[in-house]
Amino acid sequence: VFLKSVLYNEIRNFCLGKAEPTTNTKKSLFDPEAVFVTDLTDRNEIFKTVSQKLYDLGYVKEDFLGDIIEREDKYPTGISMRPLSRELPDVAVPHTEGDYVSAQLIVPIALRNSATFNNMVNPSEALEVKFLFLILNNDPDMHSTILAKIMDFLAGTSVDDLNELFNSDSNEEIYDFLENNFEIEK
């Protein structure tokens, strides 16, 4: 009853212009329903499985799967983590054009077994990737910002914390860690 009263008064005062809301208005780039942990090891099978779920959630359009496979073939997104630490597995940041998505979201995908992606910097180099940050972005002006935020997160998070994240088997733990540690605004 007390909490209902406090909430009621907060809403009432806000509507009357007497107070600011105290709720968290932080924009999230993550959705707990769009976090994946998989045993799949084939890149295209991973994309197929995740794409179907994202389509069911309304985040991607029908042609998303074909475009993400084609784009990954032409413009690889693997990132070697060796410059940060030899202890870390490699990651990838696959993405498509905004025409194929309906949201702005980062979809974390933990791989129990590695999958081969080519290096973004050196496309002829194959990397054994264990974690994906799949970028969904329907705002073309935000693409480089989201990618920069991912790079800042990787560079600014301890090796131990990244290892724990990359090797997690729990969708909830992955979501909670990213939601609490990924900085959206600076």
Model-predicted regions and their roles:
Residues 1-186:
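Cytosolic covalent-transfer regions centered on His/Cys nucleophiles
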